[in-house]
Amino acid sequence: MAYRDQPLGELALSIPRASALFRKYDMDYCCGGKQTLARAAARKELDVDVIEAELAKLAEQPIEKDWRSAPLAEIIDHIIVRYHDRHREQLPELILQATKVERVHADKPSVPKGLTKYLTMLHEELSSHMMKEEQILFPMIKQGMGSQAMGPISVMESEHDEAGELLEVIKHTTNNVTPPPEACTTWKAMYNGINELIDDLMEHISLENNVLFPRALAGE
């Protein structure tokens, strides 16, 4: 099967660093992971032949860890340590930086107005979301009750969509997370942190939406 006919989410999991390539082209492989590469490229008016060629090069590299075949309990433990704990560190620091940048550079036209508010909203939503996963959904899956978790999983997927929408607002507010020439050190550091957060959150959502949840619902 050609890459263009495969879902973005599957490609992001099977090809090393494909997720970084999709991020470069602003293609949503987490919440929009079920759309094929061809459809995603068409929506962005991108040349699918060029992207396929880049994926073919990436596919030659060895994959570090194939989570599609890992035990569900191992995936859950990885998600908590690698993503949940990391987001809990990232967002408070980014909110502090955004507060400072918006205050100090309030008179500059390029200041990302509203960024503190949007990061705070994301922090509050994710804090509640991750707590529900850790206290309710993940224990159900670990106990082999994933096939009975359609309700909680549908809620989590809906909340993933909401987080994805907030990321789009944040990208719009920050000129696609690109610092202006006059940006100070804090401003640049904050944008580096936001880019890292976006990468982490998209990988996090993709692993749940495209691997953990479907396998849990299938009764593993």
Curated annotation (Swiss-Prot):
Primary localization: cytoplasm
Localization terms from the record: Cytoplasm
Entry GO terms, CC: cytoplasm
Organism: Escherichia coli O1:K1 / APEC
Record note on quaternary structure: Homodimer.
Family: Belongs to the RIC family. YtfE subfamily.
Keyword Membrane set for record: no
Name assigned to this protein: Iron-sulfur cluster repair protein YtfE
CDD domains according to UniProt: Hr-like
Keywords annotated in UniProt: Cytoplasm, Iron, Metal-binding, Stress response
Pfam families hit by this protein: Hemerythrin, ScdA_N
Role noted for this protein: Di-iron-containing protein involved in the repair of iron-sulfur clusters damaged by oxidative and nitrosative stress conditions.
MF-aspect GO terms: metal ion binding
InterPro entries: FeS-repair_YftE, Hemerythrin-like, RIC_family
